[in-house]
Amino acid sequence: MGDNVSEDRVDVITAAYSLVGKVGYFWGGKSTVIGEDPSWGSVEKVSADGSRSSGTLRAYGLDCSGFVTWAVINGYKDQGMQAAVGDGTSDQWEKAGVVSEADAQPGDLVFQRGPEAGSNNHVGILCGKTDSGDWIAVHCSSSKNGVTVGEAYSASFRYIRKPSFYQDTTAEEN
């Protein structure tokens, strides 16, 4: 991750990594539980609108923004962080500021689309770089049916935002 990454960022990334391969994708899936949520894996009806899976029965898990919220809550060990990180991709976008790729750090959020996408977006967390300098992201992917790690650009992430709750000063403010 690098030597200049704050402890808060490392804790959020560590929490995010703890779910890789363990939690399935569930449209509208959220959790503010500190630790593993006992409801993960139980069969639930997808009640959120806007997906082909809406109305179907699936193993409960997280969607992309729910994963980001859970990782932040668990990184800080504070359920109150839900308000700071936001609910849903559009809220998470709004609660984060612009940061250039050169100034981005592990722990910053990445989005596939800009603000015009509203809630029709996808979000992940930057977690490091490849040997060739490309960003790596951890995210909860519907196409991979769960939490996965991979090259950010290959996963169509194009926008980087610094969450306002980080106390470092490398991001340009909106």
Question: Model-predicted segments: where are they?
Answer:
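Low-complexity, Gly/Ser/Thr/Pro-rich intrinsically disordered linker/tail segments
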Residues: S154-N174
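A broad, low-specificity signal marking well-ordered, structured residues that form hydrophobic/aromatic
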Residues: I13, V20, W135-V138, R158
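Residues that form or immediately flank small-molecule/cofactor binding pockets and catalytic motifs
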Residues: K30, S142, F165
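Low-complexity, intrinsically disordered short peptide segments enriched in small/polar/basic residues
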Residues: R9-V10, Y17, A96, K144-G146, ...
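N-terminal capping segments
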Residues: M1-S65, T69, N74, E173
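Intrinsically disordered regions, especially transient/low-confidence alpha-helical propensity segments
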Residues: G24, D37, F67, S90, ...
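...with weaker cross-activation on analogous glycine-rich loops/strands in unrelated enzymes
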Residues: T69, N74-V149
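Surface-exposed beta-strand edges and their flanking turn/coil or helix-capping segments
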Residues: W40, C127, G150-S154, E172-N174
